[in-house]
Amino acid sequence: MVNQPTKKTEVFLSLGSNIDPEKNLKYACRELKKAFGNIQISSVYRNKPIGFEGNDFLNMVVKVKSSFNPNEMLDFLGRLESATGRNVGTGAFDSRSLDIDMLLYGNLVHQEKPFQVPRIDIELYSFVICPLAEIEPDGIHPISGKTFKDLWESFNQEEHPLNKVSLKV
């Protein structure tokens, strides 16, 4: 009997940190490479925190191809966050050693707990849509049907300004 290759799904992840961000983003990318092999990485962007006072965040988007189902992916990402000292009990608007959100899981549309894809953050925050449009400009949002490039170009970029930073991860 021949083993069938496991089908892999394209998964897009948003990574952010404002506590030792250079170290934590490098750690996350290293672990993602170990787990998934070849990954695609956006530029890194600096932005002010939204909804609270704190250090600037560094944010990026990473594309992986995974045989994990969505729940397995969430468990894996939670372990990466915990390894950097992230306290999962912190509020939505708080400093973070590492925050990894699953933005897209293939073309899956799932809007119930424990996860939502596509994640609404794609259309709300420049630090999500800008790097996503950078690495997948012609990708199609599974609900709106718009390309990520079009979503970024129509985004109010003055409301959430970003600065690209030079960081090798």
Q: Can you say where each PLM-predicted feature lies in the sequence?
A:
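Short, surface-exposed acidic-centric catalytic microdomains
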Residues: 27-73
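Amphipathic, positively biased hydrophobic alpha-helical segments used for protein targeting
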Residues: 25-27, 62, 117, 156
